Structure formats: structure tokens, C-alpha cells
């Protein structure tokens, strides 16, 4: 028994780095946020994130002497990944009798897949979309492979995480403003507010109604807007589609863990001469965590 792997690998191998990077970093999808995350590489299954917090104390230096003051706190937090795969296969003969049969050559050496580049492109986009949803909405208790940021915030054991707070405003603008006012002062300058496309759409219309909105259309799709009177951005997040909660944090606080971004994640397509099937295999690991619970605000709408 043997395999003929020379048929379809040329397209995938030539672009392998692009395919792998796009598939695990959210390339070329609408509203992706994974590229904003801090990356923790070399994580196989579970690892501790080590970080420190330094608080220097300024003293009166008008006299001689030395008095050590201040604090340096070393902290760690677990981040866990799941090994994720995608497997599929196609029989090129299934194209016979269909509109696509013009791309099929009927012979014993046929080892190509009609619309190969289109299929691989859709695979990458599909993985992007599912990973984006997983890192935000994943819940292992519901059978998902990892816990996403919403689940992590809701289950935080830190009293400093602001979760379950009610954004009492009736409009998206008022709810987002309520969330903004809950962001701790120490983090607000770097914070971003993440909302679903539905909330973002309503927010944009609320700004129009208040005459706070200006968009010239030159920058393509509208994915973020500032809160008027601040430098905090509101980000349209497709991973939050269907979620009526508002999440605010500092992007550097949001960690995406994996083994390697290119070397070990595998995107492979090949022709199996034994069963005459074209097969694809994608394999990578992924997980998310937050470093500082007190830099997270999660609000729910008023009942």
C-alpha cells in the first residue's frame, strides 16, 4: 500500500504559511479580533502565565538615607488549550453529471480536486469564523472545546472582575456609556469595548440620531467607533454574534495561547491513491485567558 501525495499539495504547500497563519489568526474575516490578542507561544496543553506588577513609591529625597519602599508582585494564572482538528474528504467522481464536471479528467491518474483553491479558501474562512466565536463564547460545560472570554469573566474567582453589572440604559449608546463608566481608571486609557454586530449597528444609529456620527466611507467596512468625548473605541466583534452582553478590557490583557503560530499547526491536503479520495487535515491547539481580572468589565442589559 502507498500514497500518492504529489497531486494537490503544490497549492497548499506553496501557500502553507499563509493558510496556517490565516486559519489560526483570523486573517481576512470580518470583525475578527484575534489579531489584537497577546500571543503566548509554546503552550502544549496547560501552562501558567507569569506576570508582575510593580508599584514604585516616590519619597522625599531632600535628606540623606535609604528607605526601600514600593512593591513588586509576581503572579501567575493558568491558561489551558485544546487540540483542535478538522478532517474532510472528497471524491472527485462525485462531480460527474454536475455543472462542475468540466474540471474533471476521467482517467486512472486523476488526482486533482475541482475548485481546489476555492475550497481551501472557504476552509480557512470557516475555521476563522468558528475560532473567533470559540474564543469569545466557548463554554466547556456546553460541550465546547475551550472556555471563551465571556465564560471566563462570568466564572472569575476574582472579586475585582466587574461582571454581572447592569447597563441600565435603554439604547445601545446608553448601555455602552454605562459600561465605559465602569472601566477602572487605571485601565481606561487602553481599553476597548467589544460588542456584537447587532449592538454595534444600533450604537452607530444612536450616534447618528445624536449628530455624533461622521463616516466618509473611504475606509471600507465600519468596524469601530470612538465613544464621543473619549479615546475608547467600541469594536464590532463577530465572535459575539448573538450575545447581548458588552465586554470591555485592554487588548494586551487578552491572551491567546497555542504551540506555534506556523511550524506545528498543520494544514495538509493530499490525494490518497488507494481510495481515490482527496483529503484535508487541519490540526492546531488554542486557548484564551485574561491576565488581570480587574481589567475586565462585563455588563448585561437591564431586565
Regions found by a protein language model. Name each.
Residues 30-31, 130, 134, 183-190, ...:
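Short secondary-structure junctions and interdomain/linker hinges
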Residues 96, 100-181, 298-303:
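Alpha-helical scaffold segments that mediate packing/assembly in large oligomeric complexes
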Residues 91-102, 195-199, 249-251, 291-292:
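Helix N-cap / beta->alpha transition motif
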Residues 2-59, 110, 151-170, 202-303:
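Sequence/fold signature of self-assembling virion shell proteins
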Residues 55-113, 117:
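Long, hydrophobic/aromatic-enriched structural stretches that serve as scaffold segments
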Residues 135-140, 190-196, 216-219:
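Short coil/turn segments at secondary-structure boundaries
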Residues 174-210:
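Ordered core of a single globular domain
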